[in-house]
Regions:
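Repeated scaffold domains used in trafficking and secretory/extracellular systems
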Residues: 39-48, 90-101, 138-150, 188-205, ...
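Short glycine/acidic-enriched loop and turn motifs that connect beta-strands
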Residues: 59-66, 110-116, 161-163, 216-221, ...
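Beta-strand-rich domains and repeat architectures in extracellular enzymes and scaffolds
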Residues: 35-72, 91-97
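Beta-propeller fold detector
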Residues: 83-89, 131-136, 175-185, 234-240, ...
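C-terminal motif of bacterial Sec signal peptides marking the signal peptidase cleavage site
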Residues: 20-23
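Entry beta-strands of beta-propeller and related beta-repeat scaffolds
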Residues: 49-57, 102-108, 151-156, 205-214, ...
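Bacterial signal peptide processing site
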Residues: 25-27
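Conserved Ser/Thr-centered positions that define the repeating blades of beta-propeller domains
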Residues: 75-77, 123-124, 164-170, 226-230, ...
């Protein structure tokens, strides 16, 4: 595979990052309540844009030896083949976070080792070339840490719960970020106090293009989803029905913009649910029971998928009244699923889910067709073991 175009950003990223200082943050609020069980959404995920379908997975070896390398793959629109698209020039041991914009994809590098800030990279040609960007702070350890609006306005959720905003994509690339909200301020606001906000997990944009933030709350049955209206944060009104899993505390694991609204993935104890918002009301799915999540993500039209610790995979279409559908047992080593893209795949690709399985530096792509997984592609990634030790 030709990696020439991407390699041109190596020097640019290195120079852009050299001038940054260590990120600083706001101390999280202290609340005298019992913290709910910690559930962290894994960074392994996939998303769809007009350019294609993207997947993030960790490859290599032990994280303790810094031999874990996060990689970005793309299945470009109107094709059924995957390609390696990881921006070069920055250590990615800390993980990658990505968000699609209007004809672009923004990737953020989480800090690792001595790196205390999060370099960015943006592509407008489906990952063939990347432009470096700056964020003088550490991105949160969650797949929803970046959001890009149709106008190019960009949000970043930091590790300490602060939300920063850049007015345009150019401002984000130039490092012109300003604080939008802090965890302390959101927790002290009326909706934050009402739900007992404890932490932030995702950012997005609502149907009115105003920022949305989501997190974890300690009040049973109430989800911490907030909308920004001219600097005043209000509850988005996501409350689960008054029986069943809603009796537990709610954690928002994922949040994304969809046409006319938003979609969210929620954890309530050992139950996982999807929810959709049209700007006025929420629709909540029936629950799926699971002890843990290996990966999760969203697809076109508010669809969503879950890869559970048991190896079971569940998908939901996103339409009102839709229910979770179990996929056949995924192949061994599967770390992430990828939904059908917004465009039509090449003839014979089936238009169904792909399962991306990792073994060391080898990625194997399996495609679901007629109720069974079939191997369709294999990619060997040039992992540089020992380069980050």
């Amino acid at each position: 595979m030709n990696r020439g175009p991407a390699s041109r950003i190596r020097i640019g990223l290195a120079l852009a990052c050299a001038g940054l200082t260590a990120g600083c943050g706001t101390q999280a609020a202290t609340v005298a309540v019992t913290r709910p069980p910690a559930v962290t959404a894994p960074l392994s995920t996939s998303l769809t844009t007009a350019q294609g379908t993207w997947a993030i997975a960790v490859m290599g070896g032990s994280a303790a030896s810094h031999n874990n390398f996060w990689q970005l793959f793309v299945r470009r629109a109107n094709t059924g083949r995957w390609s390696l698209a990881t921006p070069e020039g920055v250590a990615d041991n800390g993980g990658l976070v990505a968000a699609g914009g209007n004809g672009s994809l923004v990737v953020g590098f989480r800090p690792s080792q001595e790196l205390a800030y999060s370099p960015l990279a943006t592509s407008t040609d489906a990952g063939l070339n990347w432009t470096p960007g700056l964020l003088d702070a550490a991105l949160a350890d969650t797949p929803g840490a970046i959001a890009v609006g149709p106008s190019g306005r960009t949000l970043a959720l930091l590790q300490d719960g602060t939300i920063e905003a850049a007015p345009t994509a150019d401002d984000a690339a130039a490092g012109r970020w300003t604080p939008l909200a802090t965890l302390k301020a959101l927790a002290a606001s009326a909706p934050g106090r009402s739900c007992g906000l404890k932490g932030m997990t995702a950012v997005s944009f609502g149907p009115d293009q105003n920022p949305i933030a989501a997190g974890s709350c300690v009040r049973p049955g109430v989800a911490g989803v907030f909308t920004d209206a001219g600097g005043t944060w209000r509850s988005a009104g996501l409350t689960l029905p008054g029986n069943g899993p809603s009796m537990g505390t709610v954690r928002v694991l994922g949040l994304t913009a969809i046409p006319g609204g938003n979609a969210a993935l929620l954890a309530v104890g050992t139950s996982l649910l999807a929810a959709w918002w049209d700007g006025t009301r929420w629709t909540v799915s029936a629950p799926v029971t699971a002890d843990g999540v290996r990966a999760l993500g969203f697809g076109p039209g508010g669809s969503a998928w879950l890869l559970l610790d048991s190896g079971q995979a569940e998908t939901i279409a996103g339409a009102a009244g839709s229910t979770w559908r179990a996929l056949p047992p995924v192949p061994a080593g599967t770390t992430v699923l990828a939904p059908p893209g917004t465009g039509t795949l090449a003839p014979g690709t089936g238009g169904s889910y792909d399962a991306l399985a990792v073994s060391g530096s080898r990625l194997t792509v399996w495609r679901l067709a007629r109720g069974a997984w079939g191997k369709v592609q294999q990619i060997t990634v040039p992992v540089q073991y020992g380069s980050s030790g």
